[in-house]
Amino acid sequence: MKQLFLYLWFICMSTLTYAQQVTLSGKVEDAYTGNGLQGVMVTIRPAAGNRILKFTKTQADGSFLLSLNAIPDGRNVLHFSMMGYAVKTIPLSKDTTVYHVLLAEQATKLKDVVVKAPSIRQRGDTISYNVASFADANDKSLADVLKKMPGMEVSDKGEIKYNGKAINKFYIEGHDMLGGRYSIATNNIHQKDVGSVEVMTNHQPIKALEDMSFSQDPAINIKLKESAKSRLVGTLKAGGGMEQKKGEKFGKLNVWEGEMSLMRFAKKAQSLNTFKSNNIGTDVTGEGNLLFSDDGTGVMGNSYTLKDYVNVSPDQLTDISDSRVRKNQTHVFTINNLWVLGKNTDLSSQIVYTHDRLLSSSFSNTQYFLNDSTIYDVEDEQAKQKQNRLVADFTLTSNGEKAYVANQLSADLAWNDVMMDIAGSYPNHQQVNMPKYKVSDKLELLHRSSKRTYTFNTYNAYMVNPHSLSVDNSQQTAYQSVRSAAFFSHTNTSLGFFLKPFTVMMKVGLQVLSRTMKSHLEGVPDSLGNMRNQIGMTFFRAYASPEAEYNQGGWHIRFQMPITFTPYYYNDKLMGAKENASKTLVAPQLSVSYFLTARLQATLSGGIAQREVDEQNFYQGLLMRDYRNLYTGFVDYTADKSKHISFNISYKRPLATVFANAYIRKSWSDSHLTVARNFVGDYIINSYFSNSSSSENLMAGGKVSKGLGFMHGLVSVGFDYLRFDGFLRQNDSPSAYSSDNYMLSAKWSGRPVDWFNFTYELNWDKDKMVLKNLGFDSSSTNLAQNLTFNFQPLKSWFIKLHGEHYRNQIADHQHKNLTLADASTSYGFKNGMELSLTALNLFNQRTYGYTIYSGLTRTGKEYQLRGRTILMSIFFHF
């Protein structure tokens, strides 16, 4: 009886206790971005005291749970605190168990205590770099500091990679104002206005897919300082000086530069406007270029563009900076705005205008290696190029947890005029007009219902390229006109299911193309071929792509197998010939990733494909690309085959500032056609020969970087290797060849003492070409080194010394050394103003040369450098 009584008493007490059990839950978000905050301390404490009664921390998505026997009375509060955010307290109520809390950022101030933030912090998949830890007084833009951060790579074009992977989004305070044109921000936002740079290592930009579709791509979010928010900030720069031009006296004011950036980043709106103008060689035209795009590639992408049948442009440099050679007048302005229409809805606009006038002078000596001889061409080129470009994008985006809507209206209008005088083997004067016009609209819809997603996407674009080329020589005048135009439409829909850990999806779509091309060539011998083209091409490409993903236990596996059916309708209006065909192609792909540890990830991927027909090569008449090269197409619907396999491995220890990645990729291609070129008189006839050929590519490389905390520096080493085995038919004789390219890079930077920092960079490459038929090989090596010293003798006085050394092979067993030196000094004032004096090319070096290989061709190039320049400028940051 006693045992029965105790048992009943225990049951009653347990039931009573369970009945009183209460769970408080909720979510804590950033008041500005709306993103969930991880690691917020949530406590229950008396309203008038600090004694903690119960506590927990928020999860990765900002959610929290607190289990209580009963809700305390109204004299207790929920207390939310996190470093960098204002504390928030909410009185407890017996009627409320779910709380939605917004925390506002706030600088943490400690009386009489100096707190030094860690240079790198990690929170889940997000790595935060403290900008102040990597910046010094000589750094102006955010890009200057990004280059010093371990794991970061910033190319000369402004593209950002994190541990070897290109970023897929760039945010400013959680908003995507610039799309893929993020170098506008990195080159114009002053580093002193940025508090931190956040890297989201596995970023899924569509919130509704965050737990359904895994992404391995990183993204960057710029966190501004509180002092740079909700007010106008920016920079001003103006300067002028003298360049010692050939044949002119030194002392004439003939160079200038001006820059202005004005921006405001508030909670509900963002604005970033820039203007840059100079004739000192600095290339700012690339700031408005897309550095990434979500248009995709291949059969399921929107990347269709018209081919440039005419293409004449000044020679492009490698290794050395463009600013050493560019003789320019450049003006660029950008207007970028974003308006926050709702919690997840943004409207953004971008307008970019570029005007660039460029003079160039170069010399080249080209060798064409044939089986029975070598052909030599010499060119002395003097070119004048004028480019104008206007780009406008208007984008509406709603990115919620249940639905995603985005619509982008774009226009890209470009004008490109070139006049070029050629002396040497084939003296001539070329004049070319190459405008390009494109307008497009892209709509993306996604709806998520529990474990299911539905998408609908449509993209429509119209593009036209009316090009013309005239070539005058001592014997005749040749004229080529080409007008190509296309309407491209792509619509697809998909249905996906999330059956954890699997995601399966079926996507079906239709691409429609209607393209015309009309050309007329005169002034070349009729014996070379037909001089006119007037063709039309239409296709309707239907496809279905089953896709499946597995994501669990460190494994991420993705498989897709697009199947396409394409009827083609080709009409040669001049020949009165119609050639129609239908093709069914399959291209399965598999990718397997495994996180061996939280720091080490490996990915193996591969695929087999039948490549889509290159219908823009469907033409019969000749087209003159430049004064020397004529092209003719080939109408053939046979599909080429390809396969590839790749392996990537990456390792990171952010808090120890160690990053490493390596890759290897092998690809094979089988074609039913062989690329052919024949040397006929003054011309090279480029065409296709109906004979099967194959090629192979091998790429391998890696990079290791390590932060040097003891000297506030960085050391990195990288290596890349590229091998190509191919086949080319020259003068009706087959030539098998291979090329090898080796590239080594290294960087060492540091700030061992407060008043001195340095940066050293090394780049070495070797090109080798082998003609297998003859057993002949040729190679060249190039070495480039850069060394920069920055001194700070006084708090506001700075001195910069910069040197460059190049050792390039210009002929067999013959190298040329070139040393360039610059120096500058500046003085800063408390109001943000800075005066500087800069001397460029102190030794007044005049030429730069190197050798390159490409497709059984070896070319030695030499360029005219800008002369010694003295520039005085004033800079102001406000």
Label each residue range with its predicted role.
Residues 20, 61, 71, 83-93, ...:
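Membrane-proximal, glycine/serine-rich, low-complexity loop/turn segments characteristic
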Residues 38, 65-74:
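Short Pro-Gly-centered beta-turn/loop motif in secreted/extracellular proteins
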Residues 743-766, 774-878:
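Conserved C-terminal beta-signal and adjacent last beta-strands/turns
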